[in-house]
Amino acid sequence: MKYAISSESMKLSDEKTIKSGVSAIELMDRASHALFCVAREIGANNIAVVCGSGNNGGDGYALSLKLLDSGRQVQVYGKIPKTQSAMYYYDILMDKYSERFCPIEKMQSLESFDLVVDCLLGIGIIGQLSAEYASYIDKINTGKYIVSCDIPSGLNSDNGKKSPVSVIANRTIAVQSYKTGHFLADGKDVCGKLEICDIGIEIFGKKYFIVDSKFVKNCFSIKLNNSHKGDYGRCGIVACSENFVGAGKLAFASSTSILGESAMRVGCGYCYLFVPQKMLPYMWGEVTHSCIFSHKDLDNHKLDSIAFGMGIGDNPKLCEKVFRVQCEKIIDADAINYLAKNKDSLKKLKGCVLTPHPMEFSRLTGLSVQEILSNPIEIAEQFAKDNNLIVVLKGATSIITNGEQTYLNTSGCSGQAKGGSGDVLSGIIGSLLAQKIPAFEAAVAGCYIAGKTAEIVADKSSVYSMLPVDIATSVGNTLSSILKDKIWVYYVNKLKIEWFLQINYEIMHFLE
């Protein structure tokens, strides 16, 4: 499974590799070879390489030598290196090709080059860039095609935030491992096509795994022919407020029905929608695939999971009522806002799934949104650990953690930035919980399913026109593509067993 690491882990791994006997000069040579292969693949002959004063710049100087030795037209813009290994390649460049070097301060627009290779800043950047470096980045961004070494310059490699500008790359060649900043915040918008170059560094430190279809496939069991709806769980969805009036009731009835549909399409046996008594007449015309009850009926039904909080408004009694129900839970929206004001109630939700967006998480933690986005993984991990919960911190890349394990879900698209998309996610996770999939795995798989389905929908329509209901109705396409191999293998194995039993029977019959 693919994974990302922090800048601290990368530096530690780098240091251990050098101590093991592989020199920093050799590592730069390997990284520059990977960049050279990319330049050769692109077919560029007129190339600008922009080098900073650190080891990222050293990769650039080593690359420049390879490009010039191969006969390509290269202009090198750079600063004098501050590290010995980078200085090694800088000195060779100045001995052999000094006429191809220009101080970075004299760099102008790079629009005339076929390829610009960004080796300005590496993973060590912290805080705001100076005006000087911001101007360098602006000039790099004039390039026709930009390849960044390890991380686009100006992007924080841990939290993915621009500082406040960054190179906008067409391709980013991550050295040895993805960094968390490649995926968080602005990372997905500025990295372009992401690739890893293996330069022989063993990774130490924590790994943040990136959810894939194989993980999701392993969460599901085969639906046997000899089974019934009770085998696949009862998912309860407790939503809606009686304070909606007029057209608002109709709108929310439609939204709540999407929750039920997303739950059923992921495979639970039953879905029960619990809404205020006054909303029942509006629900009857909208819902065709779920049973509908009032909030008052919640105690009368045995449930395997509850998805709760969507559109309930300020309703303390309902919150406490739901928290007392003994089953798996996913808590979202207004129920999270209730917990922010009543933190003692978190003790009643051990092992449950919380799905806040950054503003809701800000209310829960007491930290500002800016503080959270500056260090989202560690803050989410600590909150989950302190409260024995599973946290899904939603974003362009969602962070799913139980305090010990942390996954990054990179599936999804900007078309999910619409009201109701979070409701679909809640329904999906609620359904997985009802099917007895452990809470952490259900949260991880649910995020991937929702995001992957959104990508499929966007391909067929657009990120502008797609609606949350489109995701709910299209979940089957995603599950079909993920699970078809699992089902095929199951039946192949079944046939093998039947064949073995038949052969064994015939042998025994012959011996008799």
Describe each region flagged by the PLM.
Residues 1-76, 81, 171, 182-328, ...:
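Small-residue (G/A/S/T)-rich helix-start motifs and N-terminal tracts that mark the onset
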Residues 115-128, 308-314:
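Rossmann-like NAD(P)-binding element
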Residues 87, 131-134, 163-166, 374, ...:
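Short, conserved loop/turn and helix-capping segments at secondary-structure boundaries
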Residues 120-207:
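Internal gly/pro-rich beta-alpha loop/helix module
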Residues 36-119, 128-149:
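Nucleotide and nucleotide-moiety/phosphate-recognizing core
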Residues 111-112, 142, 168, 302, ...:
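Alpha-helix C-terminal capping/helix-to-coil transition sites in glycosyltransferase folds
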